[in-house]
Amino acid sequence: MSRYHTFTAADAVEYARQFGQVADPQALVTADEIGDGNLNLVFKIRDTAGISRVIVKQALPYVRCVGESWPLTLDRARIEAETLLTHSQFCPQHTVKVLHHDAELAVMVQEDLSDHHIWRHELIQGNYYPQAAEQLGEYLAQTLFHTSDFYQSAQAKKAAVSRYTNPELCQITEDLFFTDPYIDHERNNFDPVLLPEVLSLRQDKALKLAVASLKHRFLSQAEALLHGDIHSGSIFVADGRLKTIDAEFGFYGPIGFDIGTALGNLLLNYCGLPGLAGPRDAAAGREQRLKDVQTVWQTFAARFLALSQEKTQDPALATEGYATQFLQHVWRDAIGYCGSELIRRTIGLAHVADLDSIDDEEMRRACQRHALSLGRALILVAPHVDDVGGVVARIRQSPSSLTPQRC
């Protein structure tokens, strides 16, 4: 009989006392539930002084806002904990620390990050963390290289692909990224004023062919252990520090997906800034987002290439020039997935505050239109791009009219 039961606040406190690795466990006395609680219960465990000491996170067996008609596997809690532990093995400085997890209870205890801030909120507020983009690039390089065929043996990699198979959560990604935005689906959510743009996307054969290719690669290319949901809301930042959280969508997939999702969230902020700040601050912020895009990719590519030269195990993959060739393929994937993120976050089920929190209705719509046009352009140009500088230059010069020619 399963030991699973939904935690109360009291359960969370008691669990943290047992497994929170604090020196004074009996000082843990209260639990505050945080987050939207639709997929998980997340508790901040506080001590007698009211200080948050650890986090207890438990997966729910269904989407709470819908009910038991939308069940979800509890195994995602194991996958999340093991993904974070694996990523922490190779990049501990940028991965939240997992203190304990129990697969049967679908629960995890992790370090408290109250001294950090959600990166999306900071980007919206105009607060700049100069090392964040470089640190994100480092995280992506370390985690994706060390879980790829460049580093793992074929036997270990195949076993890991099986262990991290995550069909239910991958199905969510497959639908929300690659299917729903391009059909009339009840999950889609957009301002009716945007219907002409939405219909144009649905009727664009070249775009839909490109999206089909991106989806096929997502379904079939088990290149590395992805975070699977690496947006600016799953990244915490502080002065000189960055930590990733929420890896329940982890699975072995195309490396460019994680990179593209991360870049897409920087560009969502880029699109929203004219509605979030005054003209001068918006212009400066947008220029910084483009620099951040360059920094993330350049840091990732340089570190991945250096790691490949130092640590590649397979003699064929160690052939001079192959890693550079492989990174070209990753870059083109990343640009396509970046465009997919822009579109699905604008008209699909799950939106972002970078656009939706804009108070002025007309400005919000203009920013949303920009995100849609930029997303479409990136998807179409992706097979033809060679470097990040060329793409950034085109976005800067003519942000709504990228054309699919070699950059």
Swiss-Prot record:
Binding-site residues for ATP, renumbered to this chain: 40, 57, 111-113, 246-248
Substrates-to-products reaction catalysed: 5-(methylsulfanyl)-D-ribose + ATP = 5-(methylsulfanyl)-alpha-D-ribose 1-phosphate + ADP + H(+)
Involved pathway(s): Amino-acid biosynthesis; L-methionine biosynthesis via salvage pathway; S-methyl-5-thio-alpha-D-ribose 1-phosphate from S-methyl-5'-thioadenosine (hydrolase route): step 2/2
GO BP terms: L-methionine salvage from methylthioadenosine
Entry binding sites for substrate: 229, 344
InterPro entries in the cross-refs: Aminoglycoside_PTrfase, Kinase-like_dom_sf, Methylthioribose_kinase
Annotated EC: 2.7.1.100
Keyword line: Amino-acid biosynthesis, ATP-binding, Kinase, Methionine biosynthesis, Nucleotide-binding, Transferase
Cysteine pairings via disulfide bonds: none
Pfam families noted in UniProt: APH
GO molecular-function terms, A-Z: ATP binding; S-methyl-5-thioribose kinase activity
Subunit structure: Homodimer.
PANTHER family recorded: METHYLTHIORIBOSE KINASE
Family from the record: Belongs to the methylthioribose kinase family.
Function: Catalyzes the phosphorylation of methylthioribose into methylthioribose-1-phosphate.
Protein name: Methylthioribose kinase
Organism in which the protein naturally occurs: Yersinia pseudotuberculosis serotype IB (strain PB1/+)
Name of the encoding gene: mtnK
